[in-house]
């Protein structure tokens, strides 16, 4: 009866998520990289429609280092759907995010039952770094969803080693192929399955001959997965197979970015190449909701308490999740890659973390079952923490991806000052509305200005402003002569140009973006200055 309740709760949550996506996907601002990514998708479409003769996609900026799975679909949908292209991308990205949540539910269900599956789904659903990001982080969330499905099939396959049914191998290969069709980071999924097979050989096989047979049989069973993964990667990332060293070039670029950029670490400006090894851990500890962290703490304590009673040979599915969690985290600690934008580039580990945390909370309920008062207190704590997170996400809408928990600072304003704020400049969607309203009011009082064109400087990509402004405004690169200035407050870019503040986009008393009127400024006051590092 209880299990059926959790199943109904999960389905109800899925339904609520679908409604949420359909009602809000048009409310999210365009992110910095969306234009170049969409152009890349259009160029890939030209590559195929031209019979492989138009290869401009592989000379466009550095986008050839990435797969175009998402962008190719978006470029195709643009031709057939009667929607604005950016709305198409945001809806498609949200669909990927939703698919990732299905994978988390199914994975946790396979490991620990309906209650844990519901809790894992709920945890991911209230994580702003996933649900808030899934509309605008088109590359990160789509990749994370594919990796979540690769993990799901890895879990299923772990129960069948060394003789893996063909249909499972093909499904695993498809998930990995789609992931590689987005980023070279999909190679992590390949590493996961390799580690799993090696651990299975060590735990289950007897003599050396048996171990070799077990390993060989596993390899043979996985060959179809490798074949379909390679084919899908080649379709969505053709550059990868156009040179024998292309995959290695992409892998190197993944871990060592070659450009000058800063990030925020507890109030300090830090070059992305000099971030501490704990950068990702620091951001996970403040970007995940408190209830999520409680789940991770619970699963860690459970493992410590029951470590001696765990039969590793029977725990390959659980080991699969552990591999998916530990491999990228250990990679960051060892390789110390250039990192920025908080957890963005490692969004793909959030599903595995949600699985572990959901199981942790579920097991904690079981352990506390004999202790009524403790159990009720634990449940009350979980409900309060979850409610607080949901309220915070509601207030932040549509900027849920900026969510920070209470460990990040005394309040949200302090958190987005000391850590990365609106790095995608998505809040410009509301900043442009403030500017248009300001000019509307001015033109009502001064009808002679109706035909005037105003120049606007934007601390973001130009199209993020022009996409929402009408013909009265012209986005300019000449910041000195600009009439108006729009910027998110991330990294103090709003302070680069002076001007009278005529509009502020705020959430939880924290400014996310500003609009400045610069028309009355003269001389040196019109010149840009370096963003202060305070």
What are these regions (language model features)?
Residues 6-12, 104-126, 145, 162-167, ...:
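Transmembrane-helix signature of polytopic, membrane-embedded enzymes
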Residues 120-125, 132, 148, 152, ...:
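Short helix- or helix-capping micro-motifs
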Residues 91-111, 149-153, 304-308:
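Transmembrane-helix motifs of polytopic, lipid-linked glycan transferases
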Residues 47-50, 66-68, 72, 79-82, ...:
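Transmembrane-lumen/periplasm boundary regions of multi-pass, lipid-linked membrane glycan transferases
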Residues 150-169, 203:
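Membrane-interface transmembrane helices that cradle and orient dolichyl/undecaprenyl
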Residues 68, 72, 80-102, 121, ...:
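Loop-to-helix entry region of an early transmembrane alpha helix in multi-pass inner-membrane enzymes
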Residues 31-32, 129, 135-142:
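Short acidic/glycine- and proline-prone juxtamembrane loop motifs at membrane-interface regions
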Residues 27, 70, 238-241, 247-255, ...:
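Catalytic lumenal/periplasmic loop and adjoining terminal transmembrane helix
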């Amino acid at each position: 009866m209880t299990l059926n309740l959790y199943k109904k709760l999960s389905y109800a949550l899925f339904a609520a998520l679908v409604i949420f996506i359909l009602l809000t996907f048009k409310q999210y601002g365009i992110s910095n990289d969306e234009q170049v990514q969409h152009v890349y998708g259009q160029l890939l479409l030209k590559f195929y429609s031209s019979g492989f003769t138009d290869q401009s996609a592989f000379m466009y900026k550095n986008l050839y280092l990435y797969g175009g799975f998402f962008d190719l679909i978006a470029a195709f949908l643009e031709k057939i759907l009667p929607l604005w292209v950016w709305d198409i991308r945001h809806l498609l990205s949200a669909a990927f995010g939703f698919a990732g949540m299905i994978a988390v539910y199914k994975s946790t269900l396979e490991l620990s039952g309906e209650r844990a599956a519901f809790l894992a789904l709920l945890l991911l659903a209230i994580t702003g770094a996933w649900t808030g990001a899934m509309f605008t982080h088109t590359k990160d969330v789509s990749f994370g969803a594919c990796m979540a499905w690769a993990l799901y099939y890895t879990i299923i396959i772990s129960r069948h080693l060394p003789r893996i049914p063909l249909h499972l191998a093909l499904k695993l290969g498809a998930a990995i192929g789609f992931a590689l069709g987005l980023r070279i980071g999909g190679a992590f999924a390949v590493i996961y399955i390799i580690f799993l097979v090696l651990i299975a050989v060590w735990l289950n096989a007897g003599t050396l001959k048996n171990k070799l047979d077990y390993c060989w049989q596993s390899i043979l069973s996985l060959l179809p997965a490798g074949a379909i993964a390679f084919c899908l990667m080649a379709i969505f990332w053709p550059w990868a197979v156009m040179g024998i060293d292309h995959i290695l070039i992409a892998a190197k670029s993944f871990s060592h970015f070659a450009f000058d950029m800063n990030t925020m670490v507890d109030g300090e400006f830090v070059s992305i190449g000099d971030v501490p090894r704990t950068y990702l851990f620091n951001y996970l500890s403040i970007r995940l909701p408190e209830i999520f962290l409680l789940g991770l703490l619970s699963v860690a304590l459970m493992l410590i308490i029951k470590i001696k009673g765990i039969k590793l040979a029977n725990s390959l599915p659980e080991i699969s999740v552990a591999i998916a969690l530990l491999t990228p985290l250990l990679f960051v600690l060892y390789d110390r890659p250039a990192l920025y934008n908080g957890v963005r580039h490692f969004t793909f580990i959030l599903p595995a973390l949600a699985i572990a945390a959901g199981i942790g909370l579920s097991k904690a309920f079981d352990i506390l079952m004999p202790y009524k008062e403790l159990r009720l207190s634990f449940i009350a704590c979980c409900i309060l923490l979850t409610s607080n997170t949901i309220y915070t996400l509601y207030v932040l809408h549509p900027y849920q991806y900026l969510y920070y928990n209470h460990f990040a600072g005394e309040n949200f304003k302090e958190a987005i000052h000391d850590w990365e704020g609106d790095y995608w400049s998505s809040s410009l969607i509301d900043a442009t509305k403030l500017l248009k309203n300001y000019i509307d009011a001015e033109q009502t009082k001064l009808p002679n200005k109706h035909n005037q064109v105003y120049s606007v400087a934007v601390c973001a990509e130009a199209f993020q402003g022009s996409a929402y402004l009408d013909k009265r405004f012209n986005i300019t690169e000449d910041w000195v002569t600009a009439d108006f200035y729009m910027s998110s407050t991330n990294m103090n870019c709003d302070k680069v140009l002076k001007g009278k503040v005529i509009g502020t986009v705020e959430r939880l008393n924290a400014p996310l973006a500003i609009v400045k009127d610069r028309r009355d400024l003269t001389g040196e006051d019109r010149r840009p200055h370096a963003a202060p590092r305070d």
